């Protein structure tokens, strides 16, 4: 699959696993890239809301949240499922967030932020959002605030570009390692993604 057409989820996962097997720590790099993306577009002191889901996409958002908090941003974290079942790398990211003095809540804040980081679901999502997640996505969309999606907007099937329910509408999508093919072809997934950006994290796709 040519880069212009995007890569399959399997191709991206295989490249990720090769890098991890070589001892590469990718989550700190992804989180730093997301934080840098926000910092380049919003002044210090801006209110950032990081939506952290139950997987490693949520871990990327937590790393970004910790870095932005340390840089002087007002950062809020919403974790609808809490930290209890996070995978190991994301659990370390959560510990880093707490060590930075951060706290989290399960619900959205009452006041809309200046910008939202979407770390709810990444390229692994292949089923419709359940009612709880869909309600959250709809509420964020209703704010009409700029959203940075990490890897893929939550609610989009990264392989097909289908929207699984109603997707979070991003102004920007920052893909890591490679852009998923569901974001590169015309369709609802591409429309939800907004402006596409890529950080390879130094990982080569075969």
UniProtKB/Swiss-Prot annotation:
Residues that hold (6S)-NADPHX according to the record: 56-60, 122-128, 151
Catalyzed chemical reaction(s): (6R)-NADHX = (6S)-NADHX; (6R)-NADPHX = (6S)-NADPHX
InterPro entries cross-referenced by the UniProt entry: YjeF_N_dom (IPR004443), YjeF_N_dom_sf (IPR036652)
Names of required cofactors: K(+)
Keyword check for NADP: yes
A GO MF label: NAD(P)HX epimerase activity
Role noted for this protein: Catalyzes the epimerization of the S- and R-forms of NAD(P)HX, a damaged form of NAD(P)H that is a result of enzymatic or heat-dependent hydration. This is a prerequisite for the S-specific NAD(P)H-hydrate dehydratase to allow the repair of both epimers of NAD(P)HX.
Protein name as annotated: NAD(P)H-hydrate epimerase
Annotated source species: Bordetella petrii (strain ATCC BAA-461 / DSM 12804 / CCUG 43448)
Lineage of source species: Bacteria, Pseudomonadati, Pseudomonadota, Betaproteobacteria, Burkholderiales
